[in-house]
Amino acid sequence: MSEETGAADTLTNGEDHLPQVALIAQYVKDLSFENPSAPGIYQAPEQPKIDVQFNIGSQQAGEDVYEVALKIEIKATQGDLTAYAVELVYAGLFGIRNVPEEHLPPFLLAEAPRLLFPFARRVAADAIRDGNFPSLVLEPIDFGALYMQQAEQQTALAESQPAGEA
């Protein structure tokens, strides 16, 4: 008689091979609020012009652990005066196991920032409000679309580069 083994018996623990992603921690890594034109700026009659810039970075922090940092810079100006400037780096540690290498960049540069953004937005809004300025609510950002746009630009750039000579 021969013994038959099922597919389930060939793996010691099938769940060990499934992709797993978990948010381990999220935190303010760096926060700066500057109010260089106080107290005169509070008497200015007009609303400040707001400029918002953001950047996303990721790095491996350990085995199966990645840090994703969302940097937000907000500058409010009235004429040639700076009403306030906020620089925030809000980061998260993500545990990632059994995810194919080609799927890491979309997660680290699109999905992870999407998860962090609401919390970073609140920290920035609180800092601005605590500086005695009208609270600023940042509009949601479509990080997935931005990632796709950047990936397409990089592909187009790579294709436009002349091939090296052998």
Curated annotation (Swiss-Prot):
Where primarily located?
cytoplasm
Segment forming the signal sequence: none
Q: Where in the cell is it found?
A: Cytoplasm
Please name the GO terms of the biological process aspect recorded for this protein, alphabetically. protein folding; protein tetramerization; protein transport
Q: Gene3D superfamilies this protein is in?
A: SecB-like
Query: What are this entry's molecular-function GO terms?
Result: unfolded protein binding
Task: List, alphabetically, the InterPro entries matched.
Answer: SecB (IPR003708), SecB-like_sf (IPR035958)
Q: Which UniProt keywords apply?
A: Chaperone, Cytoplasm, Protein transport, Translocation, Transport
Assembly, in brief, is: Homotetramer, a dimer of dimers. One homotetramer interacts with 1 SecA dimer.
Q: What does this protein do?
A: One of the proteins required for the normal export of preproteins out of the cell cytoplasm. It is a molecular chaperone that binds to a subset of precursor proteins, maintaining them in a translocation-competent state. It also specifically binds to its receptor SecA.
Q: Which family does it belong to?
A: Belongs to the SecB family.
Q: What is this protein called?
A: Protein-export protein SecB
The gene name reads secB
